[in-house]
Amino acid sequence: MPTIQQLVRKGRRDKIGKVKTAALKGNPQRRGVCTRVYTSTPKKPNSALRKVARVKLTSQVEVTAYIPGEGHNLQEHSMVLVRGGRVKDLPGVRYKIIRGSLDTQGVKNRKQARSRYGAKKEKS
């Protein structure tokens, strides 16, 4: 426990919080190259084959990123844009791939929440 005089001299140091998306190095998004595209199974109460990709970012860090939406065109060596955001039922997946940018196509036949999935407005 410091004395009042020690606090006057030095003050208290702020605690540094833990960054949830360290691989992005403080940027909102980061470009990367897919090294492996595969499916993974979720944690206990859920059951599915979730589409994920191993991505080597421009920050030289390799991360596992989730591919949102139905269907995708990604394969090895595809250029993708990665943002932060974890998938709750996939352990270790703390990033998501942005649909509709670089080599990633938007979701086909998407009517609602189109901007999240890079889908263009269909002509009526």
Curated annotation (Swiss-Prot):
Q: Which InterPro entries match?
A: NA-bd_OB-fold, Ribosomal_uS12, Ribosomal_uS12_bac
Region Disordered: list its residue ranges: 105-124
One GO BP annotation here? Answer: translation
Its cellular-component GO annotations read: small ribosomal subunit
* Keywords, ordered alphabetically: Ribonucleoprotein, Ribosomal protein, RNA-binding, rRNA-binding, tRNA-binding
> Known PROSITE patterns for this protein?
RIBOSOMAL_S12
Query: SUPFAM superfamilies annotated for this entry?
Result: Nucleic acid-binding proteins
Compositional bias ranges of the Basic residues kind: 108-118
The answer to keyword Transmembrane applying to this record is no
Classify the source by domain of life: Bacteria
> Which GO molecular-function terms appear in the entry?
rRNA binding; structural constituent of ribosome; tRNA binding
| Matching PANTHER family | 30S RIBOSOMAL PROTEIN S12 FAMILY MEMBER
Q: Which HAMAP family match?
A: Ribosomal_uS12_B
What function does this protein fulfil? With S4 and S5 plays an important role in translational accuracy. Interacts with and stabilizes bases of the 16S rRNA that are involved in tRNA selection in the A site and with the mRNA backbone. Located at the interface of the 30S and 50S subunits, it traverses the body of the 30S subunit contacting proteins on the other side and probably holding the rRNA structure together. The combined cluster of proteins S8, S12 and S17 appears to hold together the shoulder and platform of the 30S subunit.
Q: Provide the assembly information.
A: Part of the 30S ribosomal subunit. Contacts proteins S8 and S17. May interact with IF1 in the 30S initiation complex.
Entry similarity comment = Belongs to the universal ribosomal protein uS12 family.
Q: What is this protein called?
A: Small ribosomal subunit protein uS12
Q: Which gene encodes it?
A: rpsL
